[in-house]
Amino acid sequence: RYEEFMKNILTIREKEIFTLLIQNKTTKEIAKILNISEKTVRNHISNAMQKLGVKGRAAAVVELLKLNEISL
């Protein structure tokens, strides 16, 4: 199934970053929380969007919500 395939496509870190994004955290705040650089945060977001086949963080969040990968 498509949903099962997509469920395993993102890394734990990518899911973690989107969980923080929906909590209204900035890239800078996420970097500080996870002890990684802002560039690394942006790379994770970009990689996740590419894997999900979407453009933009909001579209990625919608897709992750549909897949029950993150929750509000």
Task: Identify the meaning behind each predicted range.
Residues 1-40, 67:
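Helix-turn-helix DNA-binding segment
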Residues 49-72:
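Basic, Lys/Arg-enriched C-terminal extension of HTH/homeodomain DNA-binding domains
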Residues 19, 43, 62:
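DNA-binding alpha-helical recognition surfaces that contact promoter or target DNA
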Residues 27, 45, 57:
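Helix-turn-helix DNA-binding elements, focusing on the entry/boundary residues of the two helices
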Residues 13, 44-47:
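Residues within the DNA-recognition helix of helix-turn-helix
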